[in-house]
Amino acid sequence: LSRYQCKVCVLEREEDVCCGTSKANSAIIHAGYDAEPGSWKARLNVRGNEMIESLSRELDFPFRRDGSLVLCLDEKAYPDLKKLYDRGIENGVEELQILNRDEVLSMEPNVSDKVYAALYAPTAGIVCPFHMTIAFAENAYTNGVSFHFNTEVQQIEREAKGWKITTGKGEYNAKCIVNAAGVYADKIHNMVSEKK
C-alpha cells in the first residue's frame, strides 16, 4: 500500500512488528495447491509465491526455494493427493508433480519407507519470518507509513466518510481499514460486521 498515493498508518498492539502471528508461522512460502480454485486465497497464494524471490532480493531478507512434499502413505489416500494436484494445476501452480514411491525416496531418503506417493511442489520455499516482516515494515516506513506501537484497537465505528477507530492512545479516522490482526482478526472483524 505504501507505494500508492495514500496515507497509511499501522496500529500495532505490540511493542514492535513481528510479535504476534508473524513470528509464529511455519515460514513456508506455499506453492498454492491447497486453496479452493477461483478463490482470493488461491490467486494471492500463487501470485505471492511468484513475487517472493524478487522481494527477498529487493528488501534483503533470506529466502530459499526448496520445494515441498505432501506425502501419501497408502493407496487409499491417493485420491486426496490427486485432488491437491488438480487444484494446484487449476490455480496455476507451475512444475507440480506427483511422484511415485521410488522417486520420493530418491529425493528424500529419510521419508518413511511406507510412503506410497507424494505431491512435489518445486516452487514452495521458506523464509525467515522475522527478517521478512521487519524488511516489509522498514520498506513501508521508508515509503511514508506511520507506525503506532502499543496501540490496541478497542472500538471501530462507521462514520459518514469512513471509520473512527478508538484505541487506548486516542482516536484515528480512516477511509478504509485493512485487518491484519493475525489471531485477533476475528475481534476486529466483529467490531465492524453484523455477521459474527
Protein language model regions, located:
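Dinucleotide-binding Rossmann-like beta1-alpha1 core, especially the glycine-rich loop
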Residues: 27-107, 116
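Short loop/edge segments at beta-strand edges and connector loops
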Residues: 12, 65, 100-101, 149-151, ...
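Glycine-rich beta-alpha-beta "Rossmann" dinucleotide-binding loop(s) and their flanking helix/strand
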Residues: 187-196
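Helical element adjacent to the flavin cofactor pocket in flavoenzyme catalytic cores
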Residues: 119-176, 180, 184-187
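Glycine-rich FAD pyrophosphate-binding loop
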Residues: 2-24
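Hydrophobic anchor at the start of a short beta-strand
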Residues: 6-8, 95-96, 177
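A short, glycine/Asx- and small/polar-enriched loop/turn
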Residues: 24, 76, 108-115, 157-164
